[in-house]
Amino acid sequence: MWTGLGPAVTLALVLVVAWATELKPTAPPIFTGRPFVVAWDVPTQDCGPRHKMPLDPKDMKAFDVQASPNEGFVNQNITIFYRDRLGMYPHFNSVGRSVHGGVPQNGSLWVHLEMLKGHVEHYIRTQEPAGLAVIDWEDWRPVWVRNWQDKDVYRRLSRHLVAIRHPDWPPERVAKEAQYEFEFAARQFMLETLRFVKAFRPRHLWGFYLFPDCYNHDYVQNWETYTGRCPDVEVSRNDQLAWLWAESTALFPSVYLEETLASSTHGRNFVSFRVQEALRVADVHHANHALPVYVFTRPTYSRGLTGLSEMDLISTIGESAALGAAGVILWGDAGFTTSNETCRRLKDYLTRSLVPYVVNVSWAAQYCSWAQCHGHGRCVRRDPNAHTFLHLSASSFRLVPSHAPDEPRLRPEGELSWADRNHLQMHFRCQCYLGWGGEQCQWDRRRAAGGASGAWAGSHLTGLLAVAVLAFT
């Protein structure tokens, strides 16, 4: 009898371990319901009427969301609140003049909160539909030590304000008090802002642009030894912001590539570790779920209009998809649409390179979700540092023109082969959406919620043990 139960117990233990190592569930996708969203947030609406070079509308349908960061656009699926669009954000302007108190402890949180309703209502005018809301406050950072270089003005003024009140204090005491006052006020400004806007527009996912960051820009000084890894001290500092992650409902890191990193493994490592850090933060600071991560990138290299190479499309969009991000937001400013020539270059790049890659990755992520996760989760690379991507297999699929007017210019034709499914099984696992569980997101936790969640989990494990016993006795 006991020898017969040996393999059953072994199998049951394997199943229990697999259950225990399940990824935390995350928010289901918004917009189109796809597991990986690609959004276009570039003010290209000017290319047609102003420069007589409109982008191909069928190319633009490849994106799940289209928006513009320009001032005149409201009620969009993606809304970016720059510093002058949300309340009274204390900061110093480009000429060094104090605005709204300069430093957070010198600003009026009460007046700031009083103004939020009108500003949010102006840009997001209705509760529905759900969308992304990104607060872009970049002038100071809530962790004192991170206010280096041109941001040191916030530390200097903070020390000055304390020294005025306590002229007899030694510099060390002044600095310590200044840090406390700055960090406390910064925290209050960010926390209370999030709490207010979440209550006012609860269907939107809210977070701060560039949070978290991992400060892995040392490729300029250390090209030969650069790994892309986030310094341990910066990972620790991100954990000091647990209060921010707990209040956020989405994370919005940035992976803009400098041309220095073009078509290099350094570029891929730079992106990969930034996204991995965002996913780590998204996972560890919530007990029962992981926050969705939407990665900001650009269709071009930073500070220019040169389109990303194929390798760098893979290193940015492809890497984000394979690691398990909820999506990418392709952002650009008015520099993309200053003339007929800039619009033409962008239009050609979209048709030639960007749109075919976006269609490929979007559909590959969708097929993986269907095949691996029953459509109730997204595929996540088992080994974050592996060189495996969510790409349609060239032996099973091809992109063909779509002639339907309401569809993107390209669509995939083909189906997953046995080899494709085996590859996905080997290299990717599922992160289920909230309400679903199991290795392949096959268990409807909402249906099982008639009993306590603990009782449901227990009955599930009991079932696994029973199956194992039946199989080996």
UniProtKB/Swiss-Prot annotation:
A lipid is attached at residue 451 (GPI-anchor amidated glycine). Its main location: membrane. GO terms for cellular component: apical plasma membrane; cytoplasmic vesicle; cytosol; endocytic vesicle; lysosome; membrane raft; microvillus; perinuclear region of cytoplasm. One of its GO terms (molecular function) is hyalurononglucosaminidase activity. Residues 452-473 form a propeptide. SUPFAM superfamilies: (Trans)glycosidases (SSF51445). Glycans are attached at residues 77, 106, 340, 360. Its EC number is 3.2.1.35. Keywords: Cell membrane, Disulfide bond, EGF-like domain, Glycoprotein, Glycosidase, GPI-anchor, Hydrolase, Lipoprotein, Membrane, Receptor, Signal. InterPro entries: Aldolase_TIM, Glycoside_hydrolase_SF, Hyaluronidase. Disulfide bonds join 47-343, 214-230, 368-379, 373-430, 432-441. Transmembrane segments: none annotated. It holds the Pfam family Glyco_hydro_56. It catalyses: Random hydrolysis of (1->4)-linkages between N-acetyl-beta-D-glucosamine and D-glucuronate residues in hyaluronate. It is a lipid-anchor; GPI-anchor. Catalyzes hyaluronan degradation into small fragments that are endocytosed and degraded in lysosomes by HYAL1 and exoglycosidases. Essential for the breakdown of extracellular matrix hyaluronan. PANTHER family: HYALURONIDASE, HYALURONIDASE-2. Interacts with MST1R. This is Hyaluronidase-2.
